[in-house]
Structures are given as structure tokens and as C-alpha cells.
């Protein structure tokens, strides 16, 4: 009987090992590496120059038909490619950007998961291949750190304490709070980007790219050394209100976060990793990961500087009229812009 139990246990372990497979992807310079694990739970980790940055972090997407992408899924094919080229960036800080990365696509039934490794970051996204409409009930996005890292997070500013969903109605403006992950406030959401400090001056910046017809990612403390995710539910009923009656206020929510009508790519989940602080500001990953422009003719777009009324609260010195949202104020802004070679004037809410 004892021998039978040992045999059964060994057989189960062998089946588990067979069901679980790992696929690795490295950046072009070899410093950044992610290992993707499939089987019971799709997950990935990140190392930088041999140092653990993220431990196995589960990812998933739950559909309204009960299907969960990323659970008990086995890829039918894994394809790879490398890109080394340039992309045009006519309205960016450079006219052209170098683009170099390695990509790995895991193909599952009905969906793919794409991973990219750049020299300064790792990114992944889900891709829907099916043509039937469905609703996304939940997306699982977790970040499991190897220890209780220090994080810099911008909390949403709650309008009413104790009303959790009202945090989704915010201006995405706040000062950053610095604390260990385990000491972050559990009922407060933080918007992106956030930065985590690891050993040897390694920093990890979490952000997202290509957000379209989908709610933005918020993070909050999870279990242990974990940041987990939350998303604004899809609006069910809205009323006009807010500042100067300019906004639609959600009064009731659906039990899902997004509608999907056709094949599409979902937002990139991005981890920028570096041990040089200035690279956090100079990285071009957000631009490189974004979809190409859909405009065929961009000749009419003329970038330029702007005289901004809101920035100084409509305050003007040396004028003989009362400043505010009125014609004399904007005439003064137009004259100022013309005199100083400023191409545009913005009417923030006038």
C-alpha cells in the first residue's frame, strides 16, 4: 500500500511538471529577462542583471461566459521574433527613434499573450482572436516583489471617505506618497505610473500603454509583498454634473469592466527597469509600444508652444480690466502669444 502511494504521488508530480512549462525571453543586451510559466496559472517573473525584480506574478482575464484566460491553458504554439529598426516620431522629442526588442507570442485557443523585452523594460498584453462579442469581467494583474520594497505611489483623492468606487472619478493629480508596500493604505487606489525601489539602485516603474476602449489600471496593496490591480466597472447609469456641469457622473455600475465586439489587442502592461535614475525620464517605451498613427495625412498638424490660462489662474498684471473667463482676458493672451512667438492659446474651460 505504501509503495502504491509513493507511486501515485510520483505520478501526480510528473503530471504537474509536464503540465507546467516555462518559456524565457531576454532583452537585446541580455540584462533583462522574463520567464513565463504556463499550466495551472499563467505567470511571469523579471530579473535584471541576475537580480530578482519580480517574482512569479500571475496574469489572467475573466470573461462573462466563465472562461478565464491564463488558467489551465496550454499554448498550441510559441513564436519568436526580433526587431531592430527605427520608427518615425514627427511630434515627439526626436524625429526618429531606435526600436530594438525581442518578442515572444504564446498562442492559446481564442487568445494570444505577447511579451516584449527591451533593454529598458518588459511588457506584455492579451490579444483576442475570436470574432464573437463578450464582456471582460476582470483582468488579473499582480506584481509580486521579492521583498517589502519601497514604493512611490500617487493615491487618488477620495471625494467621500468610505465610498470606494468614487475613487475612479478623479483628476489623476496628486503628490506621490513613499512607503513600503506592506504599509500602503489598502482601501486607497493609486494611479499610474508608480515606482518601486529594489536593491543596487534598481528601480521598477509600472505603467500601461495603448489604453483604448478599456478602463485604466489602478493598483493597491495585495497579499504580502504584492501590488494587485483594480479597474473601474463599466458605467450602467450616468448623470451630468461635476465641475461646472461638464462631466458625466456614474451613478450605477455594471458587473464587468469592458465590452469587446471584435478581435483586438488589450493594453500593454509595462515594467520599466533600470539602475540609472535618469533613464526613468528618458525611456521611450510608451511611444514605442503605442499603436502607429491612423492618420494618413499629418501635414496639417503644426506643433507649437501654448499660452495657458489655467496655469496662472487667469491672473494678469498691469491690465485695466477684471481678469477671468472673459473676452478681454483672452484678447490679452492672444496679444501676448503673438508678441512672443507663441503659436497657440488654449481656452482651458472658457
Specify the residue positions occupied by each region the protein language model found.
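An acidic-aromatic substrate-binding cleft motif
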Residues: 257, 261-336, 340, 344
Amino acid at each position: 500500500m505504501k509503495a502504491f502511494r509513493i507511486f501515485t504521488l510520483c505520478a501526480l508530480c510528473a503530471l504537474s511538471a509536464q503540465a507546467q512549462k516555462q518559456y524565457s525571453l531576454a532583452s537585446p543586451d541580455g540584462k533583462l529577462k522574463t520567464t513565463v510559466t504556463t499550466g495551472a496559472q499563467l505567470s511571469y517573473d523579471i530579473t535584471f542583471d541576475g537580480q530578482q525584480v519580480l517574482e512569479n506574478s500571475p496574469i489572467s482575464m475573466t470573461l462573462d461566459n466563465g472562461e478565464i484566460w491564463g488558467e489551465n491553458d496550454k499554448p498550441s504554439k510559441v513564436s519568436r521574433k526580433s526587431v531592430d529598426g527605427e520608427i518615425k516620431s514627427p511630434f515627439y522629442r526626436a524625429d526618429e527613434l531606435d526600436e530594438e526588442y525581442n518578442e515572444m507570442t504564446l498562442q492559446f485557443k481564442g487568445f494570444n499573450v505577447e511579451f516584449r523585452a527591451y533593454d529598458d523594460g518588459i511588457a506584455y498584453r492579451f490579444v483576442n482572436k475570436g470574432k464573437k462579442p463578450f464582456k471582460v469581467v476582470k483582468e488579473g494583474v499582480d506584481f509580486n516583489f521579492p521583498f517589502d520594497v519601497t514604493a512611490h505611489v500617487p493615491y487618488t483623492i477620495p471625494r467621500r471617505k468610505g465610498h470606494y468606487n468614487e475613487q475612479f472619478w478623479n483628476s489623476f493629480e496628486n503628490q506621490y506618497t513613499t512607503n513600503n508596500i506592506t504599509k500602503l493604505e489598502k482601501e486607497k487606489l493609486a494611479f499610474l505610473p508608480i515606482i518601486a525601489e529594489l536593491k543596487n539602485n534598481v528601480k521598477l516603474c509600472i505603467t500601461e500603454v495603448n489604453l483604448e476602449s478599456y478602463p485604466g489600471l489602478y493598483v493597491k496593496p495585495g497579499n504580502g509583498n504584492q501590488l494587485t490591480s483594480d479597474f473601474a466597472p463599466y458605467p450602467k447609469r450616468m448623470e451630468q454634473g461635476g465641475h461646472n456641469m461638464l462631466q458625466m457622473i456614474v451613478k450605477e455600475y455594471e458587473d464587468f469592466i469592458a465590452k469587446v465586439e471584435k478581435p483586438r489587442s488589450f493594453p500593454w502592461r509595462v515594467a520599466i527597469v533600470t539602475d540609472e535614475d535618469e533613464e526613468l525620464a528618458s525611456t521611450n517605451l510608451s511611444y514605442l509600444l503605442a499603436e502607429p498613427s491612423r492618420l494618413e495625412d499629418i501635414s496639417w498638424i503644426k506643433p507649437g508652444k501654448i499660452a495657458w490660462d489655467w496655469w496662472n489662474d487667469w491672473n494678469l498684471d498691469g491690465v485695466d480690466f477684471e481678469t477671468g473667463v472673459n473676452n478681454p482676458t483672452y484678447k490679452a493672451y492672444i496679444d501676448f502669444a503673438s508678441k512672443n512667438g507663441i503659436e497657440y492659446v488654449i481656452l482651458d474651460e472658457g
